[in-house]
Amino acid sequence: MIPFWKKTGKHSKPQSAQKRRQNAKPAVPRTAQQSIPMQRMFEDGTCRVKPNYYTRTIQYQDINYQLAQQEDKTAIFEEWCSFLNFFDSSIKFELSFVNMATDSTEFEKSIRIPFQKDGFDDVRAEYSQMLRQQLAKGNNGLTKTKFITFGVEGESMAQVKPRLDHIQNDLLNNFHRLGVQAKPLNGVQRLKLMHDMFNMDGASKFHFDWKDLVKSGLSVKDAIAPTAFAFKNSRTFQMGGIYCAASFLSITASDISDQLLKDFLDMDSSQIVTMHIQSVDQNRAIKTVKRTITELDRSKIEEQKKAIRAGYDIDIIPSDLATYGRDAKALLKELQSQNERMFLVTFLVLNTGRTEQELENNVFQASSIAQKHNCNLCRLDYQQEQGLMSSLPLADCQIEIQRGLTTSSTAIFIPFTTQELYQSGKESLYYGLNALSNNLIMVDRKRLKNPNGLILGTPGSGKSFSAKREITNAFLVTDDDIIICDPEAEYAPLVERLHGQVIHIGPASTQYINPMDINSNYSEEDNPLALKADFILSLCELVVGGKEGLQPVEKTVIDRCVHVVYRKYFENPTPENMPLLEDLYNALLTQDEPEARHVAAALEIYVKGSLNIFNHHTNVDIHNRIVCFDIKQLGKQLKKLGMLIVQDAVWGRVTANRSAGKSTRYYADEFHLLLKEEQTAAYSVEIWKRFRKWGGIPTALTQNVKDLLASPEVSNIFENSDFVYMLNQANGDRQILAKQLNISPHQLSYVTHSGEGEGLLFFGNVILPFVDHFPKDLELYRILTTKLNEISEGAQK
C-alpha cells in the first residue's frame, strides 16, 4: 500500500522563465475579490482558473443507493468504479457536496398555497398551516446539492473547448448509465453557486447580468465575493457573518465503509465536503509500486543480514515490513490485472456555524464521524484560506496532502445516498415526509410519463385518508375536475365541504345516470360507437353472469343491437333521443337468435323489475368541479354494475374536458370489484390505458393485490401506473408486490406491520419510504378521517 504521494521537486527539470512567472507565488491579496482563485468566467460555464487551466461543473442528482437491493448496490458500485476509471491523468476533477441553509421564509413561501378568493381560502390557509408543521419536522431548511468539476490544461479557450465538450458529453452519458440526472452549469449558475458558498449568512442576494460588466467596469468576482474574509487565527476564519473551519480527512482505516461519506452528508448543518481526485498515469503508478517493493525487499534483506549476525531466525522480521510487503504486492496485482487505477485523493471538510461555539460543536460532530470510521479529521492549521479556496467548485486544490487510493478504495466514497422527491411548481402536491431524511415529498403526477396511480393497503392503513388528502390538495392548487366512485359512502363530508356534488345512486334514490349516454368526443376514432359497444358488452357480462361470461353469439347480437338503438340519436342528437337500457332490451327481443332472448331475459330485471334504477335518462348535472358517486346503497347485486357505469360516466367527462384542455382526476375505491369478470376487467384495463392520452389521471384504491395481478391483462394496470402509494401490506400481498415491483427486503420492511400513513411511494423510477402523520388538531383532519370515534368527536365539537 502506498499511503501518501508527495510532489517531487528535487530532480525536476529546469523551468522556463514563463513557467517560473506562472508558478511564482501571488502577492498577498488586499481585497476579498483578489482572494478568489479564478481569472475569468465564460458564459457557457467554462472558467479560466489560472493561466492555461480551464474547468467546467456538472450538477447531478441523487439516487437511492441506501435502499437498493444488495445486487443493485454492487451494480451501482461497479458502475461508479467505471465512472472513475474514465478520468486519465490529464484531467483533474473534484466532487463537491454542498449543504446550505435555505432561507426559511423563502421556503415557506414556496409551499404556501396562494389565496384565490373563491370561498375556499380558509381551507387553503389550514392546508398551508399543515405543510408548515410538516416542514418543521424535517430538515428541508437544508438544501443538499452535488457537483463534479473537471479541468484540463490548454493554451487558450479555443484549444480546450472541444476537449471540454467531449469530456462533458461522456460524463453526462456515464451519469445516464447510472440512472442519475445531471446537467452542466452555465456561467451564471456557477457564479451563483460560488456566491451562495461565500455568503452563507444570507446577507447578500445574487444579482448578475453579463451586460452590466462592461458598463460598470466590475468583474464577476464583485458579484460573488462576501463582504470580507477574516483569517485572524490559524484554526478558524470568518466569511461575512459566518464562522468557518477547514479540515482534511486523514484516511487511516484499513477498511473503509460506504457509509462514511453518507454520515458526513447527513449532518444537520451548513457545510461543504470536497474530494479532489487526480488519476495517476498507469505506467507511473506501476513503476512506483515496483520501486516500493524493491525498497521493501532491500530492507527485508538488511533485516535478514542483521538476524544472521545476531544469531536468530532470519524469518523473524519486523511485522510492519512483512505487512507492507504483502500490501504492495497485492496492490501491484490489482493495478496489473484487476482493472484498478491509482488515484491521489484530498478529502476536505468545511464546517460552519453562526457562532464560534456552534462551529466548534459542528467540527466536533464531524470529528466523531471520522473517528467512528477509524479515520481522523485534522484541522488545516495556518492553511484555512487555502482550505476554503480548495472547497470551491473550481477543481483547483491548494492543499498538498494526498492519499493514494485504488479505484475500488476511491469508489467506496459512493456519492449517492437517498433520493429526494421535491418538485417545485404550482401543481406539486404533498405526499408525506421522506422517512429517511424527513424532508417534504412534493410532486406533480402530471410530470410522469404515465400519471395513472394505485393506492394499496390493508384495511385501516390509511388508503381512503391518503386519497382524500390528495383530492383536497389537488382541489386547492389545480383547476382539475375531480370525480370519485364511493362504494362505502366515505367521501361525502369532504365533497360537501368543498361545495361539490354528491350523487346518491340506489333503489330509493331519485338521482339517475343513464349508462347509454354518449357524446361526439367519446372516442378518438371517427366512430365513438365502437368503444361504447365495448362498454355495453362489459355491462351485459355483469348482468348475464356465469363463469364463462358472454358467449360469442351473445356478443354478436348485442353489438348488432347497439348499432340499431343509437341510429335515431346520431340522426338527431338531442337528449330526448338518447337511448335507454329498455331500447336495447326491446331490440334484443326482435332478434331471431335464442341467445338474444337469453340476454334480454337477464336484462329484464334491470329494465322492468326492481333493479331498474339504470333505466332512466340522466337527471343530474354532473358538471360540478368535484363530484362523488355514492353507490353504497346499491348492495352486492348492483355494486359492480354501478362502479362500471360510474367509470363510463367518468370517461364521458374526461372526453368532454379534453377538448376544453382540462385534466380530470378519477378516484375508484374498491377497484378490485371490477376485475373479477373477464370482459369487465378487459374494459377497465382499456379505459386505464386511454385515460393518459385524454388528460385523465385515474387512481385506484384496493386492498386486494391478488385481483390486480389475477391475469396478464389485468397486471397491465401496474405497468400503466407510474404512481404507486403503497401502505401496510398483508404477508401474501407483500411477496407478490416484491416480485412485481422488484422491491428489496429492506424496502419491504417499510410496508411490513407499518403504522397508519406509512409505506413506500413509487414515483416513476424513484422508490421512497414515506411517513404522513397528519396533524389531528385541524378541522381538515376531522373531515378526512374515516374513524368513527374521531368523526363523532368532530360532530360533538
Describe these PLM feature segments:
Residues 2-418:
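Extended, folded cores of ATP/NTP-driven motor/assembly subunits in large transport
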Residues 63, 70-89, 96, 100, ...:
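P-loop NTPase motor domains
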Residues 455:
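Hydrophobic anchor at the beta1->P-loop junction of P-loop NTPases
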Residues 463:
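Conserved lysine of the Walker
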Residues 466:
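Hydrophobic positions on the alpha1 helix immediately C-terminal to the Walker A/P-loop
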Residues 473-483:
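Post-Walker A helix-loop "phosphate-sensing" segment adjacent to the P-loop in P-loop NTPases
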Residues 499-503, 713-726:
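A short helix-turn-beta junction within AAA+ P-loop NTPase domains corresponding to the substrate/partner-engaging
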Residues 741-796:
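Conserved P-loop NTPase
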